[in-house]
Each structure stands twice: as C-alpha cells, then as structure tokens.
Amino acid sequence: MVNFGLNSASILGIFLAVAGAGLYFLRSVRPEVSRDYDIFFSAVGLLCGLILLFQGWRLDPILQFGQLLLSGSTVFFAAETIRLRGITTEQARRSAPYADDRRVSKTRVYTEAELDQLEPEDEPVARNNRRLRGYDDDARSGRPDGYGEAEARPRPRSQGRNAPPTNPNPRPTRSRPSAGRSAPQRPGPAPGYNDNYGYEDDYSGWESGANDVWDDPTPSRRPPTRRPRPEAGNDPAPSRRPRPSNNPPNDSFGDRPERNAPRNARPYEDEPPAAYVDYQPIDEADLTPRPTTPEDPADRNQEQSRSGNPRSQRPSRSPVDGEEPPIGADDQERFDY
C-alpha cells in the first residue's frame, strides 16, 4: 500500500532523489570534475529518495531524524568531493604545457584511452660489411688488428724514381758465394723458388747483412718454365754466352744489373740447326689444275718421283769426325751397285 504524505521523511526522500539525479547529470554539465563511479552513487541516492517519499510515514520521529542526519552527511561529503575535484583540475590545467579547450558535446561522452608508453624494441643494426664471413671469424678468434692493414694501406709514391720504396716486411736472403772473377749473371728464377714450382728456403744460409732481394718495386712473377739443358756429352755444339757489355745498365733502383736484363738475352741454342736444303724452283705446270681424268701408271710414277723426299735428292755430306750420322737419313752408298 502506497501512502503519500507530506511529512519530514517525504521531504528528505525528495531531496535525496534530486541529489542523485543531479550527480548523474554532472557528467554533462562539468565533465572535468565527473568520475565514472558517480553513476553508482546517483542511482543509490535516487532509490533512497523514492523509498522515503513513499514509505516515510511508517518511521518513528527518531528514525526519521536518523535518516535526516545520514542524508545530510552524505550530501556534504558529495559536495566537498566535487569541489576538491574542481581545484585539482584547475591546478593540473595550469601546470600543463598546453590547455585543452576542446568543445565537449552534451549528447556524447568522449573518453581518451590511457595507453602505457612502451619502450621501442632494439632492432638489429644492419652492418654494411663487404668482408667475407670467414674473415670476420678470424678477426673474432684473436687475430691481431694490424695483420691486414699493411696490404690494405696504399703504398705512398716516392718523390723521385731514384728513391727505392721501403719494404714494410723485410725478409733475409741467402748469401751468395763470391767467385774469383766476376761472371755475367744471366736472369734466372727468383730466390726461394726452383724450376719444379716448389718453394724451398735454406734457413741456415740467412744472414743479417745479406742484401734484400725482395724489395724489388716490380711485382713478383713466377719464373717461366725452362727446358732442361742438354748434358755436356750429348751437346753437339757448345753454346756461347753473350759477353756482358762494359757499360753497366742504368739501374735506378739499386746495383743489381741482373734485374733489368731482358729474359731472352741469351740466344736459344739448345737444339741443333736444321740441315741445309737446296732451293728447288716450282714449275708453272705444277700450279695449273690437273684434270679429273684417271691417271696413267706412268704419270703416277713420274709424279711420285717429282714429289719425293727432298732429303734424298740433296748431296750426301760426309759426317765430321766424332759426329754421328743423322737418324733416319738414307745412306746413298747402300743403293750404289
């Protein structure tokens, strides 16, 4: 049964219902001081006000007085909380570097998402390294840093051609035995290499005062392959070496005449000269095209005798004393009957 009467409890109920509705609409009037949990307290105030409005006549005067004190205290703390919110918002606006004066719609509620500021992940740095992976592994394995700097560093140019370049890595060489007389030195393979493309070093022959032959400014080249020289017994004619000229060659890089000497200074006399062949003129009849008719046996024999081995037509030469006759040569005396 609903008994609506105008008493103190009913008046208190109307006040609580109006306060709850006002707390709800505070979000639209002053959104800077409103909070999300105000909706809950506005619903509680509206419900309590309706109960007192319709059922307040059942309460005793002492109970109505208790409801009045409780409602007054609640309204006081609600007003004080809203005032403190306004003060805090004003201080935050003054201390902020910029003022947010955006217009807020009365029909829609705008809430900004509060996102945590995350630190960016460390991305691997892309290294533009042109060296191979094997070189990087060698560098990490403990190889000294200055190992490859001598090769990568460009060689500075000398001011003049007479100034020999400096060698960053000097190496000792083998000492050369001194001969009784100065013999001409023919160009040969660089020391440290043999004709079999093998590398051999005589560590016992290194001396501190030996001349350094590795400081030649010209790039080192592999010596060309030389044919084995015939032995003294099998050599038909002794080979003669060219005599060195009295004027020493112009060597601007050091006193080493064998460095600038040409490689082919000694004539190639390893093989015996070819045998002399008499000059035989060519007939014009041989140059004319021959008919394709079948040949006669007589013409064939004549052609074979004409185009025979020129060695058989040349005069025989008596061998010199101590010289063997050439192999494969026909002995004319065997055919003379």
Curated annotation (Swiss-Prot):
Residues 113-123 have a biased composition (Acidic residues). Pfam families: Ycf66_N. Residues 111-337 are annotated as: Disordered. InterPro entries: Uncharacterised_Ycf66. It comes from the Bacteria. Residues 304-316 have a biased composition (Polar residues). Residues 133-143, 253-269 have a biased composition (Basic and acidic residues). Belongs to the ycf66 family. This is Ycf66-like protein. It comes from Synechocystis sp. (strain ATCC 27184 / PCC 6803 / Kazusa).
